[in-house]
Amino acid sequence: MSEETKADETKVLDSIDILRILALLPHRYPFLMVDRIEAIDSDLSCVGYKNVTANEPHFQGHFPNNPVMPGVLIIEGMAQTAGAICIHAKGADRKPSLVYFMTIDEAKFRRPVRPGDVLEYHMTRLNKRRNMWWYRGEARVGGEIVAEARVGAMIAEE
């Protein structure tokens, strides 16, 4: 097996834990919406995970006695997942970069996400041009699609 093949396999089998996500993204509590990323194929695709807990501040007002995760935060989690793999694909020695969320298209929300759910963000790259990326994302809980959208982001270069 060539060194190039080994490197490609490593990229496909790679995973990013919360400590690495914190090193890649500038987002912090309470606005960090991804806990782990797996099944990474360079910047082409991945699956991010978010453990939804009742302790998150948005549940205090959305909605009292009927906690539902705001859809915009689900979409934000998709964008953060895509941004993290873009930065990760640029190289392991990168410091946190600013990722600007540029577009949201074709967003659909299928069912509520509640405390105790584990969100899976299935992201697939649609296009890349210079420092901009576009992804199609599906958010799933228990294999069921709960939201979907196309998102575009730009990584600010220093």
UniProtKB/Swiss-Prot annotation:
Residues at the active site: H62
EC number(s) per entry: 4.2.1.59
InterPro entries registered for this protein in UniProt: FabA_FabZ, FabZ, HotDog_dom_sf
Cellular component GO terms, alphabetical: cytoplasm; membrane
GO biological process: fatty acid biosynthetic process; lipid A biosynthetic process
Keywords tagged on the record: Cytoplasm, Lipid A biosynthesis, Lipid biosynthesis, Lipid metabolism, Lyase
Xref: Pfam families: FabA
Catalysed reaction equations from the record: a (3R)-hydroxyacyl-[ACP] = a (2E)-enoyl-[ACP] + H2O
GO MF annotation list: (3R)-hydroxyacyl-[acyl-carrier-protein] dehydratase activity
Residues making up the signal peptide according to the UniProt record: none
Enzyme's top EC category: lyase
Location, primary (coarse class): cytoplasm
Source organism, top-level taxon: Bacteria
KW Plastid (keyword) present: no
Subcellular location: Cytoplasm
Keyword hit for Lipid metabolism: yes
Function in brief: Involved in unsaturated fatty acids biosynthesis. Catalyzes the dehydration of short chain beta-hydroxyacyl-ACPs and long chain saturated and unsaturated beta-hydroxyacyl-ACPs.
Family the entry assigns: Belongs to the thioester dehydratase family. FabZ subfamily.
Protein name as catalogued: 3-hydroxyacyl-[acyl-carrier-protein] dehydratase FabZ
Upper taxonomic lineage: Bacteria, Pseudomonadati, Pseudomonadota, Alphaproteobacteria, Hyphomicrobiales
